[in-house]
């Protein structure tokens, strides 16, 4: 069963505009080609930064969020992220015109 991971951390002060773009230009390519990762969204507002990851399975997701990953986010964003896992029971993708039920 696929898994969504919701990763959240306090928004670093001053991370906007050109500085945010620079962080994303460095960070986004890291996620291309990771085995088991289908999609990743980089999110944020004035209070929090977040990521939504769609994984092949919960085990794949949990293996990815290791100490090295946590330390890198602590270095880049100044905080240890919180990770929550959600089982994907069904999905509708209007871009591709597909649906999937996994229960």
Language model: regions and residue ranges:
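A common structural junction motif
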Residues: 71-75
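A short, exposed loop/beta-hairpin motif centered on an aromatic-Gly-Thr core
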Residues: 52-54
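Short S/T/G/P-rich N-terminal loop/turn motif that feeds into the first structured element of a domain
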Residues: 1-48, 58-67, 79-103
């Amino acid at each position: 069963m696929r898994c969504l991971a919701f990763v959240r951390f306090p928004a670093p002060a001053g991370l906007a505009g050109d500085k945010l773009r620079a962080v994303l230009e460095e960070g986004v390519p890291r996620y291309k080609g990771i085995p088991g990762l289908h999609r990743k969204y980089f999110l944020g507002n004035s209070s929090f930064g977040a990521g939504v990851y769609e994984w092949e399975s919960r085990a794949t997701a949990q293996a990815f969020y290791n100490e090295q990953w946590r330390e890198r986010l602590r270095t880049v964003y100044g905080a240890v992220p919180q990770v929550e896992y959600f089982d994907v029971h069904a999905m509708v993708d209007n871009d591709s015109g597909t649906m999937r039920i996994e229960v």
